C-alpha cells in the first residue's frame, strides 16, 4: 500500500512557538512510518517556512542548518505540492498536513483557511471552529447562548485600556470579586495569564495580557477541581475518561504545563457518575456548537458539592508533548499515542472527502 505523505507543520509566529516544537517532537517520533511518509515543515518566528535535513532541530537550537531551505505551498488545489523556493523546484507531493501549531497564526483559523485554499486536507477543526475556540470571548458567548455554564467575565480591548485605565478597572471590580484571572483572548498554554488578588496585581496582570493580544478578559475565579476531557471524532465524537489536574503552582500555568512537571495528574478523575456524564455531555455539546472537528480538549472547573460544571475553554489543537493531557487521557482510555495520530489523520481525510462533495458550480434547472 502506498504511504500517505504527511506534512507535519510546527513552530509558527505565536507566543506558543516553543510549545509547538515540543508537541511536534513527540508526534514526529510516534507517527507510524509503515503507513506514512513524514515531511517535517518548520515555521520560523518571522513566518518563513523551512524543510530539509533538520528543521525541528534548527528551530529548537536557533542555529541555522545549511541542509534546510525555504519552502512554500501554493494555493492551487490542482497541485498539492511542497515547493523549494530557491531554486524553485518540487520537493514532494503532500496528501495531508498535520498543523501542530498552537495559538495565533496556527490554531486560530488562519492556517486552516490557507490549507482550504490549497485544497489540502488537514488534521483538526476548520476555519470557523478554530477561530471561535481560539477567541475566549466569542467562545464564552456561544457556549452561554447554548446553555453551557461558563465563568462570569468582563472583556475589553487594548486600545480601551490605553485610553482609560480607570474605567476598565472600575468595570472589572464592579462586576467581579477578587481573586480574578486576567487573560489574553487569543492565546493558549496559559501564556500571558495572571491570577490577581488586588488592584495593584490587576494592573500588572492587564499590562502583561495586552502585550500578547489586542483583546483581553478578566474572569471570575471558580474554586473547583480542574478537570480535562479529550474528544475525538467528526460528526459522532467520542470522549476519553476525564482527568484531574492538581497544580503545583497557584494555577496550571505555563511552567506547570511544560517545564517543572510537578503538577499531579489524576486519571481517571475521582468523580461521581453523575458528574462524569455531565462533563462528557457538555464537552460533546461544546464541540458541536463551536463546529469542531477531529480533536479537542475541553477544560472545566467542577464544584463537586453543588455538582456544578463550568467550561473554562476548548482547545482545538491541544498540546501533544509526552506530559500533555490530551494524549494521556486517550492512553488511559485504551488508545495508544501512535494509533491516536493515525485516527486523527484518517478523520481529516474523511472530512475532506465530505467537503469535496460540495458543488462549486451553479446552474438553474
From Swiss-Prot:
GO molecular function: ATP binding; D-alanine-D-alanine ligase activity; metal ion binding
Protein's cellular compartments: Cytoplasm
Keyword Repeat appears in the UniProt entry: no
Protein EC: 6.3.2.4
Cofactor(s) required, per the database record: Mg(2+); Mn(2+)
Keyword Metal-binding: yes
ATP-grasp domain: residues covered: 140-346
Recorded GO CC terms: cytosol
GO BP, one annotated term: cell wall organization
Note on how the cofactor is bound: Binds 2 magnesium or manganese ions per subunit.
Residues engaged in binding Mg(2+) 1: 299, 313
Job of this protein: Cell wall formation.
Protein name from the UniProt record: D-alanine--D-alanine ligase
Organism placement in taxonomy: Bacteria, Bacillati, Bacillota, Clostridia, Natranaerobiales
Amino acid at each position: 500500500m502506498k504511504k500517505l505523505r504527511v506534512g507535519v507543520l510546527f513552530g509558527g509566529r505565536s507566543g506558543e512557538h516553543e510549545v509547538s516544537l515540543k508537541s511536534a517532537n513527540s508526534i514526529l517520533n510516534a507517527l507510524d512510518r509503515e503507513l506514512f511518509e513524514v515531511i517535517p515543515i518548520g515555521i520560523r518566528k518571522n513566518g518563513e517556512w523551512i524543510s530539509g535535513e533538520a528543521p525541528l532541530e534548527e528551530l529548537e537550537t536557533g542555529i541555522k542548518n545549511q541542509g534546510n531551505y525555504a519552502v512554500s505551498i501554493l494555493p492551487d488545489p490542482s497541485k498539492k505540492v511542497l515547493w523549494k523556493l530557491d531554486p524553485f523546484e518540487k520537493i514532494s507531493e503532500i496528501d495531508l498536513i498535520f498543523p501542530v501549531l498552537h495559538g495565533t497564526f496556527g490554531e486560530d483559523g488562519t492556517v486552516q483557511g490557507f490549507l482550504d485554499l490549497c485544497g489540502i486536507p488537514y488534521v483538526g477543526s476548520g476555519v470557523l471552529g478554530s477561530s471561535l475556540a481560539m477567541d475566549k470571548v466569542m467562545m464564552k458567548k456561544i457556549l452561554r447562548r447554548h446553555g453551557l455554564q461558563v465563568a462570569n467575565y468582563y472583556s475589553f480591548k487594548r486600545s480601551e485600556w490605553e485610553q482609560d485605565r480607570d474605567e476598565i478597572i472600575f468595570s472589572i471590580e464592579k462586576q467581579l470579586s477578587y481573586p480574578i484571572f486576567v487573560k489574553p483572548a487569543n492565546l493558549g498554554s496559559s501564556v500571558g495569564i495572571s491570577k490577581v488578588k488586588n488592584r495593584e496585581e490587576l494592573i500588572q496582570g492587564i499590562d502583561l495580557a495586552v502585550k500578547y493580544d489586542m483583546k483581553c478578559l478578566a474572569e471570575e475565579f471558580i474554586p473547583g477541581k480542574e478537570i480535562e476531557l479529550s474528544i475525538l471524532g467528526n460528526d459522532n465524537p467520542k470522549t476519553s475518561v476525564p482527568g484531574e489536574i492538581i497544580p503545583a503552582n497557584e494555577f496550571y500555568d505555563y511552567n506547570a504545563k511544560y517545564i517543572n512537571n510537578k503538577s499531579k495528574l489524576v486519571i481517571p478523575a475521582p468523580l461521581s457518575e453523575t458528574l462524569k456524564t455531565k462533563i462528557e455531555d457538555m464537552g460533546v455539546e461544546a464541540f458541536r456548537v463551536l463546529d469542531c472537528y477531529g480533536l479537542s480538549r475541553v477544560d472545566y472547573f467542577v464544584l463537586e458539592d453543588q455538582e456544578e460544571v463550568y467550561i473554562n475553554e476548548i482547545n482545538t489543537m491541544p498540546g501533544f508533548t509526552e506530559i500533555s493531557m490530551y494524549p494521556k487521557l486517550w492512553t488511559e482510555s485504551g488508545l495508544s499515542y501512535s494509533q491516536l495520530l493515525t485516527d486523527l489523520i484518517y478523520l481529516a481525510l474523511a472530512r475532506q472527502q465530505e467537503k469535496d462533495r460540495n458543488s462549486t458550480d451553479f446552474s438553474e434547472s
